[in-house]
Amino acid sequence: MRHRKSGRQLNRNSSHRKAMFSNMASSLVRHEVIKTTLPKAKELRRVVEPLITLAKTDSVANRRLAFARTRDNEVVAKLFNELGPRFAARQGGYTRILKAGFRAGDKAPMAYIELVDRPAAEEAAE
């Protein structure tokens, strides 16, 4: 029985899921917008939002926790130096999911997941 088991399996084993979401979270923090399938985007929210909340309080312990989840020093630096201060006044809801139609090959529902309050220069570049 799967009572009280939260999260999607996404046809992957647990280590593959953990690695995939770690990589996707790093990409989202680095680029601030990524395109992926809708179910992956919805699950990615559950990984990224706690990371940003962690980054709002800068401490060595929090930096180590963030590094343990992302395994990328550049991403940890951006989280604590840019995103933490940017979202200091916001209590959650740091990401936005925009539906982007269906993929040509297999009709999988696609979506953009982005950080809210992105700088205007990045939006103009896209």
Swiss-Prot record:
One of its GO terms (molecular function) is structural constituent of ribosome. The keyword Ribonucleoprotein applies. Keywords: Ribonucleoprotein, Ribosomal protein. One of its GO terms (cellular component) is cytosolic large ribosomal subunit. Belongs to the bacterial ribosomal protein bL17 family. Part of the 50S ribosomal subunit. Contacts protein L32. This is Large ribosomal subunit protein bL17. It comes from Vibrio parahaemolyticus serotype O3:K6 (strain RIMD 2210633). The lineage of its organism: Bacteria, Pseudomonadati, Pseudomonadota, Gammaproteobacteria, Vibrionales.
